[in-house]
Amino acid sequence: MVVMRKARDKDIPGYIDCYSKVWKSFRGILPERYVEGVIKEAGQPSFPKKISSAIMSPDRILLVAENKGKIVGHAQGRVNRGGYSWLGFIGVVPENRRQGIGRTLLTGFITESRKNGCTKVSLDTAPCLKPAIKLYADMGFVPEGYMRNHMHGLDFIFYSLFLE
């Protein structure tokens, strides 16, 4: 059974392993320089400290999905002044996709955003990530903008969910 919860320091090795596996699954989908750069960053000695700082920060949201003691998905983002949150990343390891874990993590992120007084959750994604786009649309996110050649030669779509 998959359990979604806030990340803890003891999760950091599993979090990084999950993060790397998710990014490796983007090989051949996203630009190589982008993917390999993220994977390389996750392997740096300073990366665990970066994750630990985010876990401890009151303006950050880091959630994990755990299955049989193993981190199989995660969502991370920031609560910003002005009442909105930014979902920086959400991902599930390939062998655990299509099981509702991404939806559970996104629901958890929205819940944490509400608890922090947010009235809007925003994110961006590449148009080639069709499963992510479907999830965001199914959860009520609406496109607010399109950024051409935004990063690493990729276009990005800016989405938001307005909370009531």
Model-derived regions, located:
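Extreme N-terminal starter segment of soluble prokaryotic enzymes
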Residues: 1-3
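Acetyl-CoA-dependent GNAT
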Residues: 6-12, 16-89, 93-94, 106-108, ...
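Conserved glycine-rich acetyl-CoA-binding loop
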Residues: 70, 89, 93-107, 114-116, ...
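Residue-level signal for short amphipathic helical patches enriched in basic/charged
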Residues: 10, 116, 124
